């Protein structure tokens, strides 16, 4: 049985842990390597977010933009992403998989078809960073129909009224943007992020996971004192970048996977250390 996001958060709560959500672009630098990398990530992450590469990823920083280009150049496409998720679910059904995708990809396939394929591949949720809440009704209804969580992003600039609307439609977890702007690895967790988590907790019981700019274990420890999970993306993708040769392929697969595993394992440990700290509603 493939684990749902709500079940995962319940399991973590019972263990006294917070969620470590790891992001990786499907097909980076090619499908075979990305599958191996994601298998390694699944050993330590609680939830895995798979990016479906897109030619114009507006919410992503340069690191993920480059990863999208590499993946697209290797022939990655949405149908292969479904296959990838399916394979990973056969090996790690207890680690929920979430797609991060831009609306154009969903629109091209057709909303219902896309959500149905998510269900068939065992994808637990979808994040669509460029879909505003005002235009999400149709996709939201298909997600409800097929039992797939629709995860929205909220930012420090999101006013309370809008925040309430988003939280009403959001399921699985809410993606708390730690800084306004684009993704990337930053040095310190901002105070406004902490304020935003408090606001989310005031309006909803949905788990709040913080992403955009989390790159170190210290960040994970700090953020999981107040949030239900930490999302790490660019810092993981940078490991891919570091191991590329001049042709854009992995130089030494073994070394790459070893460094990747050590990094994600260490980040997961950061969600255990502060897990006993209660979240103040």
Swiss-Prot record:
Role summary: The alpha subunit is responsible for the aldol cleavage of indoleglycerol phosphate to indole and glyceraldehyde 3-phosphate.
Keywords annotated in UniProt: Amino-acid biosynthesis, Aromatic amino acid biosynthesis, Lyase, Tryptophan biosynthesis
HAMAP family per the UniProt record, alphabetical: Trp_synth_alpha
Active site: 49, 60
GO cellular component, one term: cytosol
UniProt key word ATP-binding: no
UniProt record, GO biological process: L-tryptophan biosynthetic process
PANTHER family, per the entry: TRYPTOPHAN SYNTHASE ALPHA CHAIN, CHLOROPLASTIC, TRYPTOPHAN SYNTHASE, ALPHA CHAIN
Reaction(s) catalysed by this chain's protein: (1S,2R)-1-C-(indol-3-yl)glycerol 3-phosphate + L-serine = D-glyceraldehyde 3-phosphate + L-tryptophan + H2O
PROSITE patterns, A to Z: TRP_SYNTHASE_ALPHA (PS00167)
Pathway(s) annotated for this protein in UniProt: Amino-acid biosynthesis; L-tryptophan biosynthesis; L-tryptophan from chorismate: step 5/5
Stored Gene3D superfamilies: Aldolase class I
Official protein name in the record: Tryptophan synthase alpha chain
Family as reported in the entry's similarity comment: Belongs to the TrpA family.
EC numbers, comma separated: 4.2.1.20
Organism field: Methanocaldococcus jannaschii (strain ATCC 43067 / DSM 2661 / JAL-1 / JCM 10045 / NBRC 100440) (Methanococcus jannaschii)
Gene Ontology MF terms: tryptophan synthase activity
Transmembrane segments: none
InterPro entries in the record: Aldolase_TIM, RibuloseP-bd_barrel, Trp_synthase_alpha_AS, Trp_synthase_suA
Subunit structure: Tetramer of two alpha and two beta chains.
């Amino acid at each position: 049985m493939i684990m749902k996001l709500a079940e995962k958060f319940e399991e973590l709560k019972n263990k006294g842990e917070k969620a470590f959500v790891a992001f990786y672009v499907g097909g980076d630098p090619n499908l075979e390597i990305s599958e191996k990398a994601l298998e390694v990530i699944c050993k330590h992450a609680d939830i895995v977010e798979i990016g479906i590469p897109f030619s114009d990823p507006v919410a992503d920083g340069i690191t993920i933009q480059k990863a999208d280009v590499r993946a697209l150049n290797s022939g990655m496409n949405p149908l292969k992403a479904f296959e990838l998720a399916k394979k990973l679910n056969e090996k790690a059904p207890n680690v929920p998989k979430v797609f991060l995708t831009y609306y154009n990809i969903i629109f091209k396939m057709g909303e219902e078809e896309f959500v149905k394929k998510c269900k068939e591949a065992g994808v637990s949720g979808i994040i669509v960073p460029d879909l505003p809440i005002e235009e999400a009704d149709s996709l939201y209804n298909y997600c409800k129909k097929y039992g797939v969580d629709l995860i929205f992003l909220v930012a420090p600039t999101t006013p309370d009224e809008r925040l309430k609307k988003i939280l009403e439609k959001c399921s699985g977890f809410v993606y708390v943007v730690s800084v306004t702007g684009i993704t990337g690895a930053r040095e310190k967790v901002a105070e406004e992020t902490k304020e935003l988590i408090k606001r989310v907790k005031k309006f909803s019981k949905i788990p709040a996971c913080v992403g955009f700019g989390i790159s170190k274990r210290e960040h994970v420890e700090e953020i999981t004192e107040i949030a239900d999970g930490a999302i790490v993306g660019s810092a993981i993708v940078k490991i891919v970048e570091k191991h590329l040769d001049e042709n854009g392929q992995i130089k030494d697969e073994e070394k790459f996977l070893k460094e990747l595993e050590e990094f994600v394992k260490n980040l997961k440990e950061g969600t255990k250390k502060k897990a006993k700290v209660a979240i103040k509603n």
